[in-house]
Amino acid sequence: MTLLTIKDLTIAYGDAVVVEEVNMTVEEGEVVCLLGANGAGKTTTMSVLAGTLRARSGTVLYSGKDLLRMKLHERVAAGVVLCPEGRKLFPTLSVEENLFLGSFHRKARRSRQQKLKDVFDLFPVLAERRYQYAGNMSGGEQQMLALGRALMANPRLLLLDEPSLGLAPRLVQQVFELIRRISASRISILLVEQNSRAALSVASRGYVLAAGRIVLADTAAGLSDTHRLQRAFFGEVRRDEAELHRA
């Protein structure tokens, strides 16, 4: 079943169009990655889906409903949850306090203690440091905390923006193993990532965005062709190649 359908999405800052006629889908329980170089429009697309930025035109259906008409808090309550680029934690709050901020809406508050237990089971280091200030944690631990905070909102669709940003290679591997475990719980994930190898290791399909347009779409195996992917990153693949080949 298709959970998210994006059709002809166009986004602009004033007169400057930064994302143009993007089309994507995410199925229930699927991990889909959105790849591309800096400035391609990946985070801008995620901001529109999360509700922090308005689209100029296009349609986004989430579980059959018009996502673009929903307010930000309504999207979170419906299960559309953003784990933002750069983590965006509150450094002077404890681990536990940061996690509780993820369960601010009524539906999540009802199951707050159970979700906290689930997060601590998934990230034992957070349980060990639940009263420690978030600002005193390592980069990898902070990324786990950001993921945990997103999970506290009880997501159905997790918008995961650049989870490997600023992390050492060993920690990148650890974070993506955790993403794999999260996806095993049937949470759908739209993953924005510059580290294509890591992203394709957890995704079933992917899209490549270059200069605001989808220039390539394929299975993870198909996108693992390094030369083809590099050409797509730099916008050298024709738009008519951008057709999704399902396994």
What residue spans do the PLM features occupy?
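Glycine-rich phosphate-binding loops of nucleotide-dependent enzymes
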Residues: 1-247
